[in-house]
Amino acid sequence: MDFFWERMLNDPQNHFSDDQKEFLNHAKYRVKRNTIFGMLVGFSLPLYLARNKKVTPIRLYATSIIGGLAGNGVAQITTLAYNLSAIRQRDDGFEILRKIQDSLIRQRTTMRQGRFPSSSSEFPPKNSKYQLPGSMPNTGASSSQDPFTNSQSTEKEDAMYSKDNGFEDRSKPASAWEAIRNRNRNTGNNSFPFYEEDSSVKSTDSAFSGQENSEAFPSRTSNLGSEQLDEPISHEQEAFDQLIWNDSSSSK
């Protein structure tokens, strides 16, 4: 927090005056002082209240820790409210709040990008020794490089950033079934799975639509006679009769 606070005060785009910087530094010191005081009071208050009572040490220490955390929170909230009221009482209070808000927005944008701005006047400076999470280390290389190399490095950084945020590249299908779905979607065919049709293979839809399809079903004018068509059925009938009646002749 001290790092971001110092960067906010020293940001050239904010243009804080010396009086405003002194006021903000005093407000920061007030927050630290009251936070420590609140933690001490919250930690020691249960010890003072339980001095004449029989309380187990573990329970007493746990209550003291909880009291210290509660005192810290109460002190921070109270001090923040006091600082805001003190800012509003100043003539330039709204200007200070606007500068703080603009600085916080720039800091958040810089952290989301994960890299430092190219200009040293922006927050944070490029030659800073502090590295934000996800930022690339500064190797001191010259900025005048091949634009093709810069574009490749930018693409690599974007790919790494997308993987870190849970986004995957959907340009390639994840499986064979997804490739089939994509191909059916592009060709407008709703059948699944998809297969290529050629002149030798007819669609089953045309066979059931009432059209003539000699390759799917035999036509009425086929050369196959009724005897040849009934031959497998007659063999099955004879086998059945022989099994039941012990006779090769069919039963009437």
Curated annotation (Swiss-Prot):
Residues 108-122, 136-153, 201-226 have a biased composition (Polar residues). Keywords: Cytoplasm, Mitochondrion, Nucleus. It comes from the Eukaryota. Its main location: cytoplasm. It is found in: Cytoplasm; Mitochondrion; Nucleus. GO terms for biological process: endocytosis. One of its GO terms (cellular component) is mitochondrion. Residues 154-172 have a biased composition (Basic and acidic residues). This is Uncharacterized protein C19G7.18c. It comes from Schizosaccharomyces pombe (strain 972 / ATCC 24843).
